[in-house]
Amino acid sequence: MSSGGLLLLLGLLTLWAELTPISGQDRPKFCHLPVDSGICRAHIPRFYYNPASNQCQGFIYGGCGGNANNFETRDQCRHTCGGK
């Protein structure tokens, strides 16, 4: 296969991976952790994945502690955990 054909195949596979929805079984386990603002008192807008609604929702992060279900942007949340 030529290098052009390989690049095309790689591009198509990448596009497919980006567009394929994440199923519940494929989500990282931390996506199912409850929202946790942490123990500090900062006021940082963040997003978490809510498995009950299958949505990435906003919350206020305190700045320390919490858990891994904590994303700087809605797009990061959607890319990692899926959802709307």
Curated annotation (Swiss-Prot):
Q: Which organism is it from?
A: Daboia russelii (Russel's viper)
Lineage of this protein's species?
Eukaryota, Metazoa, Chordata, Craniata, Vertebrata
Places the protein is found: Secreted
This protein's name: Kunitz-type serine protease inhibitor 4
Q: Which residues form the signal peptide?
A: 1-24
As for what it does, the entry says: Serine protease inhibitor.
Sites bearing Pyrrolidone carboxylic acid, chain numbering: 25
Short name of one Pfam family: Kunitz_BPTI
Q: In which tissues is it expressed?
A: Expressed by the venom gland.
